[in-house]
Amino acid sequence: MNLIQIITTIILALFAACLLIQLLYYFLYFRKLAFFKDAGEISVKKAEMPPVSVIICARNESKNLKKYLEKVLTQDYPTFEVVVVNDCSWDDTGEYLDRMELQHSNLKIVTIKEQVKYRHGKKLALTLGIKAASHEILLLTDADCMPASELWLQSMVSSFAGQESHSVDFVLGYGAYQRKWGILSRMIRFDTFYGALQYFSFALSGTPYMGVGRNLAYRRELFFKNKGFGIYNHFLSGDDDLFVNMLATPTNTRIEIRPETFTLSEPKTTYAEWFRQKSRHISTGKFYKLKHRLMLGTLWASHYGIYLLGFLLLLVGFDWRIVVGLFSIRFITQSIVMGYAMKRLKEFDLVPFIILFDFFILLFYSILAVNNLFISKHKWK
């Protein structure tokens, strides 16, 4: 066996290993979301629903608040309040909130004044909002998010009202993006879907590791018992994923994927804006628990390996039909599982783009990773 044959054999073995790992993730984990059976319609009576505090942090969000706040304030729910933290806004956010407070008795405003000597991130605003909250159950969303229905609040917190509600501390929801024309919009939606496929599937498998602040519920008592965001208080990001990563367990976490539980946000309109947003979001991943880093690292390493090692096999003259055949096994499995999961999350129009975005997302995250090696500070707003 000459050197080329030895190298080819090694590359082929690694390629096969990456393929096997990918298939295992799809069959063992991702299929759980794809074929998940939810509880159907809400079985808990409205009178049995616990009081809820919705928390929204807003910095210069006047435009979005005017579009979406009313839909939050008028949810079909017996007892709830909406706490909006006006975090150092210099637009007309304050004036608009004052007007809305006169119209809605369930609106509570917390105002933070800017201090030149002290800069803070979203965690301070969120902490003050939670301190001002009157109720035990907290539902977090963002100023640029719109509930998908008037039953959003009922559906997201129904797990806190069932027979086993005492054991529930977290409910993870889906923060979707509105459908817009163009490749960027579809890529953002695919990236959001792929992230949700992971954190929902792993939660269903007994390994919850993150949630998104656009649609996340947890107990106020849990927040204060943990002394807020704990050891991550000084980090700019991580108000959602790191908090869940610290405290979520197989028994205290539920997911909600009924369409009425979704929130909808407008996607970024330029690649630069999306790049900055994602750069901030992924900066917290290195602080996840070791088992979660290994779990995600293995997934992404095998994902990269499929493309890189497949290319190397073609480069050394290996039979392209075998490479394409093996890659097709993964692609067919991926398309079936993702297709069903996309149908569950109302993203089925993305199915034709799976193979395209599957590759470009890898390139995008590679650039993000390199960028974050040289940028240590990120801004919330």
Language-model segment annotations:
Residues L138:
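Short aromatic/hydrophobic "clamp" motif used to bind/position activated sugar donors
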Residues M1-K46, N372:
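N-terminal membrane-anchoring/stem segments of glycan-assembly enzymes
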Residues D92, A143-S159:
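Acidic donor-binding/catalytic loop of UDP-sugar-dependent glycosyltransferases
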Residues F35-G40, E61-T74:
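Short, well-formed alpha-helical segments that are part of the catalytic scaffolds
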Residues F160, V168-A196, E221-F224, G228-H292:
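Catalytic donor/gating beta->alpha subdomain of glycosyltransferases that bind UDP-sugars
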Residues L69-Q115:
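Acidic donor-binding segment of Leloir-type glycosyltransferases
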